Amino acid sequence: MKMTLKELGEMLGARVQGNELLTISSVGTLESAQTDQLSFLANSKYRSQLESTQAGAVLLSEKEANNFQGNALIVKDPYVAFARVAQRLDTTPKAAVGIHPSAQIDASAQIGQGAAIGANAVIGAGVIIGEHCQIGPGCVIGEHSILGSNTRLWANVTLYHDVHLGQNCIIHSGAVLGSDGFGYANERGTWVKIPQTGGVRIGDNVEIGANTAVDRGALGHTEIGDGVILDNQVQIAHNAIIGKHTAIAGGSIIAGSTKLGQYCIVGGNSAIAGHLKIADGVHVSGGTNVTSEIREPGTYSSATVAVENKLWRRNTVRFRQLDDLFNRVKLLEKQQKTQD
């Protein structure tokens, strides 16, 4: 697909600078874009690349456009505008086209108009697949699961029974939705499994990354709100509730029955303990361990940043001496008070 700068400007509500009839076929970085591509400047540290870019046109803020003589689309937020254009010019192939003859579809399943199901997919009893869904090769959809319209499952996604997905969701390869939660009772050292009888409920416009796992609820459902984005290899434990438009980066773990608020951001390789409530608008830095409730929005961190190894070793030794140092300071304070 190709669009002129004028057409893109109308789509974005942008002001066009330069040749309105220039045809754009795709997007690219300032450093690598060619004359038929659109790029963007969203961070001033890349301003030097703007001066030498070969891009046919650039998405710019009003401030940056004052110093640029080339073709441009002037917008409020260049990065968001870039995302919109990238969506419009997207050439990603479909996960499936038509219904492959090797797909195994239960007679009781309901398949919406225009839905596509790839090779060797398995659709269980009572499944409802909405209009224009794409089910990639090798996917398994368990009994009584529901997919809203325009939802896309890439190859080898597994949905257990009673998993509900909203509209316009994207689930990447290897994701498993609805597996058993980690629920056991301990009887004198022996683990007794607790059947996980709940389901999974996922809202509209949710994207779930490759090899991510969302466990089903023990009693009641695990819930993921509208607009949530989960990166690759994220673990959502049973009965967790993820508020709408929250983002969780790769390798993070949300333990069971934790309620994570709306519009939160969880950095990569973070862990949030179970049975906690996290307020709306909380930003957890990468590598952070959250072990208690967070009641106010803001940024929270616990990880130690990388330093030169020799310094790290010295600091580690000092950390192990911290309790002794505390006791010595406490004794000195006591002696000082006695002298006073």
From Swiss-Prot:
Enzyme superclass (EC): transferase
Gene3D superfamilies xrefs: 1.20.5.170, Hexapeptide repeat proteins (2.160.10.10), MurE/MurF, N-terminal domain (3.40.1390.10)
GO molecular function: N-acyltransferase activity
CDD domains assigned: LbH_LpxD (cd03352)
Keywords: Acyltransferase, Lipid A biosynthesis, Lipid biosynthesis, Lipid metabolism, Repeat, Transferase
One Gene Ontology term, aspect cellular component: membrane
One GO biological process term: lipid A biosynthetic process
Keyword hit for Acyltransferase: yes
Assigned EC number: 2.3.1.191
Active-site positions on this chain: H238
Cited InterPro entries: Hexapep, LpxD, Trimer_LpxA-like_sf, UDP_GlcNAc_AcTrfase_non-rep
First and last residue of the signal peptide: none
Reaction(s) catalysed by this chain's protein: a UDP-3-O-[(3R)-3-hydroxyacyl]-alpha-D-glucosamine + a (3R)-hydroxyacyl-[ACP] = a UDP-2-N,3-O-bis[(3R)-3-hydroxyacyl]-alpha-D-glucosamine + holo-[ACP] + H(+)
Function: Catalyzes the N-acylation of UDP-3-O-acylglucosamine using 3-hydroxyacyl-ACP as the acyl donor. Is involved in the biosynthesis of lipid A, a phosphorylated glycolipid that anchors the lipopolysaccharide to the outer membrane of the cell.
Family that this chain belongs to: Belongs to the transferase hexapeptide repeat family. LpxD subfamily.
Quaternary structure and interacting proteins, as annotated: Homotrimer.
NCBIfam families xrefs: lipid_A_lpxD, PRK00892.1
Family annotation (HAMAP family): LpxD (MF_00523)
Name of the protein in question: UDP-3-O-acylglucosamine N-acyltransferase
Protein's gene: lpxD
